A protein has these predicted regions:
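Short coil turns that delineate tetratricopeptide repeat
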Residues: 45, 86, 120, 154, ...
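N-terminal leader/linker segments that initiate helical-solenoid repeat arrays
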Residues: 16-90, 101, 106, 110, ...
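Start-of-helix register in tetratricopeptide repeats
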Residues: 49, 56, 90, 124, ...
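Residue-level recognition of tetratricopeptide repeat
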Residues: 56, 63, 97, 131, ...
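Register position in tetratricopeptide repeats
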Residues: 60, 67, 101, 135-136, ...
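Canonical tetratricopeptide repeat
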Residues: 53, 94, 128, 162, ...
Length: 419
């Protein structure tokens, strides 16, 4: 497979401003993107559609690799497209995808709404609306947009995957799995990247439901298609941790971190090192995470939710945890931000508000072992042992990574609550 650099150099000369689309020398387009880009760039590179195709390929590659540098390259390609044909609709859609990838969700939502008013029956604009609303916690609006996708083009693949993500958030893991399975059946056997992504999401759903064996099979299928597929490695590590195979979990998370050296991945590796008894290495990894995460904390694309838990649980800085959680809460209200905010409130002794926020998150319907454990510990702190028992039992029943701590907390509840 040709390196992306060799493809991009073909268009560099056509940039009026002399801008370059150079990528890391080791970067590669997946086969589908290589086909699009090479076909386009060997025809007439002056045509705006070809720069759109290149930008779309780069966005997809950014999603596959979690390498944000591809978004800047995609933006450069879009600028050329828009110079050739100002305000062309496809370029504007791709620009929203870039905003989503850069985690500027409010700007993405605003831009997608503008495009929706311009062309009210474009399926993928509804997909962009779904994505932005999900990330911001506007779940009703996300559901409405996903339904429009299905109404306009029944059974289309992007709609199925988005509907599946919503079903999971609403607590219907089985329904989510069925939709992902339909999406997999609709995906070409030649599209290894898309199939690996879908298999990983299906494995995640089985793991979230406590079916570790089924999850393992699906995740292994994903890595057979794309060796060392980062998302699959992360979920395989969760299975190893749940099975107390901590050394194996460390090895998997080291592979993932080498492939995608992002701060949030370092945090997961540090936790696994701690569980494996490699305390000095864990301490260094946590400290490195803290420095890196703090440095990016004011950017939209950050690891602030992990940093909240680092401050709250690892270095006992509850005030910093709460300040950071409030910063995130100001602009997004998805269930995971609410969870981090609730936990920071709990660590600062603000139990009533903590309970309000965690119950707001759970009211969406999500069944997540960590959120349920947090809800249980908050309820226990307030003295509502019956609610605490209910939440903790649900966390334990999911048999996930956080279930062991829930089991320990449950065992420590007053006996009257368990009768």
């Amino acid at each position: 497979m040709k390196k992306i650099l060799s493809l991009l150099c073909m268009v560099a000369a056509s940039f009026a401003e002399g801008q370059s689309l150079a990528a890391p020398a080791s970067a590669r387009l997946s086969p589908a993107e290589q086909n699009i880009a090479s076909k386009s760039l060997t025809n007439t590179p002056q045509q705006y559609q070809e720069f759109n195709a290149l930008a779309a390929a780069l966005v997809r590659r950014a999603l596959e690799t979690s390498d944000a540098s591809y978004y800047a390259q995609a933006e450069t390609a879009l600028k050329r497209s828009l110079q050739l044909v100002p305000d062309n609709f496809e370029a504007e859609k791709i620009r929203v995808s870039i905003l989503l990838g850069e985690h500027d969700f409010p700007a993405a939502l605003d831009a997608a709404q503008t495009l929706n008013r311009r062309v009210p029956d474009d399926v993928m604009v509804y997909g962009l609306l779904t994505d932005a609303n999900m990330e911001l916690g506007n779940y009703k609006d996300a559901e409405t947009a996903a339904q429009w996708m299905l109404n306009l083009r029944p059974g289309n693949l992007p709609a199925l995957t988005r509907a599946a993500k919503l079903r999971e958030l609403f607590g219907d893991a089985e329904g989510a799995y069925e939709l992902m399975e339909l999406a997999l059946q609709s995906t070409s056997p030649a599209d290894a990247e898309e199939r690996a992504s879908l298999l990983t999401q299906m494995g995640h759903l089985r793991l979230a439901s406590g079916s570790a064996d089924a999850a393992e099979k699906l995740l292994q299928q994903a890595t057979s298609l794309i060796p060392n597929y980062p998302a699959a490695l992360g979920d395989l590590a969760k299975i190893r941790i749940a099975g107390k195979q901590f050394a194996d979990a460390v090895a998997l998370l080291e592979q993932r971190y080498q492939a995608v050296p992002r701060a949030e991945n370092l945090y997961d590796l540090a936790e696994a090192l701690q569980l494996a008894g490699r305390h000095d290495e864990a301490k260094r990894a946590f400290a490195d995470f803290g420095r890196r995460s703090l440095a990016e904390s004011n950017a939209k694309d950050n690891s602030n939710r992990k940093l909240v838990f680092y401050y709250a649980d690892k270095v006992q800085m509850p005030v910093k945890a709460l300040d950071l959680a409030k910063q995130e809460f100001q602009w997004r209200h998805d269930v995971f931000t609410l969870d981090a905010y609730a936990w920071a409130l709990h660590e600062n002794g603000q139990e009533a508000e903590a309970r309000k926020q965690i119950e707001t998150a759970l009211a969406v319907g999500i069944r997540d072992a960590s959120l349920l454990r947090h809800a249980g510990e908050i309820a226990a702190k307030i003295g509502d042992t019956f609610a605490a028992e209910s939440y903790l039992k649900q966390s334990v029943d999911l048999n996930a990574m956080d279930s062991e701590r829930a089991r320990i907390t449950l065992a420590g509840l007053p006996q009257a609550a368990k009768q």
